[in-house]
Amino acid sequence: MSFEERITLVTISFRSKSSLEKLIKNVSDDYEIIIVDNSQDFETTKEFSNKPHLKILSPKRNLGFGAACNLGAKASSRDYLFFVNPDCILKEKTIENLYQASQKYKNASAFSPKILDSKGKQTFKRRSVLLSRKDWMSRVPPTEDSEVTVIAGSAFLIEKTKFLSIGGFDENIFLFHEDDDLSIRLRNTIGPLYNIPSAIIIHEGGSSSERSPEIASLKGFHLSLIHI
């Protein structure tokens, strides 16, 4: 069995048809792909319904990011989950390098790639409002495989049994900081998190929930709660 046949890509869509097209064309048909469509977009369902390696889950309402990820994970028939935003471009061997790391660091819980923005600048998640300052990482991103205290939800690989054993994402967190919460629970329960710089993605940003006024307003509201 190839490593591709052991992995399910789980991606959450909210009016993201154009981004999904690019993502799906960029990966092998040997992967299982699960799209959770939080926008009930008929065009998304119509576009991809004829692909045998791809499943589309259409909940009756917008579940939020974490709950949608959990739904996709439970529908997976593979051993590993690669959660990835639809607006991510995967560089060559990104998933393979993450998978190889998972075989090398057996005690670890999850693996994140090096993330670049659309201009090629690296974005490194080194801290969180949910972490104490002592757990904040250096401003200098890792240049080799390294343990980290938090990973970004935009792209990471995890063994399905490990993800489900802690209940997945906290479904009470609708859209923001659910990856920080997951990172903390994984570190405390399963094992360390790793950043793998040889695995590279470009995160174009914004397309998983198209840059609509209602999404911008929702994000502003959630971020404002941090400072209350």
Language-model segments: which ranges?
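Cell-envelope/extracellular polymer assembly enzymes that use nucleotide-activated donors
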Residues: 6-8, 32, 181
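Short, well-formed alpha-helical segments that are part of the catalytic scaffolds
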Residues: 11-29
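Acidic donor-binding segment of Leloir-type glycosyltransferases
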Residues: 24-61, 71
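Catalytic metal- and UDP-sugar-binding loop of GT-A-like glycosyltransferases, i.e.
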Residues: 59, 84-86
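Acidic/His-rich active-site region of diverse nucleotide-sugar glycosyltransferases
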Residues: 61, 67-71, 89-90, 97-167, ...
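Short aromatic/hydrophobic "clamp" motif used to bind/position activated sugar donors
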Residues: 81
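Acidic donor-binding loop at a coil-to-helix junction in glycosyltransferase catalytic cores
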Residues: 175-181
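Active-site-adjacent helix/loop segment of glycosyltransferases
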Residues: 183-184, 188-226
